[in-house]
């Protein structure tokens, strides 16, 4: 008596390598991400980089000069090749960069952003911090009085 063949199982997504990089200036981190992406092969594992930056504003593709900081506070503003407008990065702010092969994982940019936002909202809720996302502006907002 032979057993029926097992049904094919969906392949699990490959693991993601997590790198905790500490305080890294924005420009070298950005350059390294571009190098990583350019050198990526079909079997290159995806990575998650966790780091902080010294104070810097980044202006994405939609960043208009009228949205830039209005005072010269000594913090540089850098034009970068990402979506969005102006973002501040600084010490004490955890930045997570996902270096994913999105085709291999079968996900688009907008669904990925929504899933990441929800993951952050859920994590903060676990610590009793109320947070929310907005459909008109990517990101997670939490107003905390320290």
Predicted regions and their residues:
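N-terminal lobe of the biotin/lipoate ligase/transferase fold
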Residues: 1-141
């Amino acid at each position: 008596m032979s057993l029926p063949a097992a049904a094919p199982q969906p392949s699990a997504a490959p693991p993601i390598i997590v790198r905790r990089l500490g305080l890294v200036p924005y420009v070298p981190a950005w350059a390294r991400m571009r190098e990583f992406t350019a050198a990526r092969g079909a079997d290159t594992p995806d990575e998650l980089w966790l780091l902080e930056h010294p104070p810097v504003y980044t202006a994405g593709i939609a960043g208009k000069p009228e949205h830039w900081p209005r005072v010269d506070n000594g913090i540089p503003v850098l034009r970068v090749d990402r979506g969005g407008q102006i973002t501040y990065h600084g010490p004490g702010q955890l930045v997570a960069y996902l270096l994913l092969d999105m085709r291999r994982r079968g996900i688009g940019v907008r669904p990925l952003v929504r899933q990441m936002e929800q993951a952050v909202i859920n994590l903060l809720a676990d610590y009793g911090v109320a947070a929310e996302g907005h459909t008109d502006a990517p990101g997670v907002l939490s107003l905390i009085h320290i």
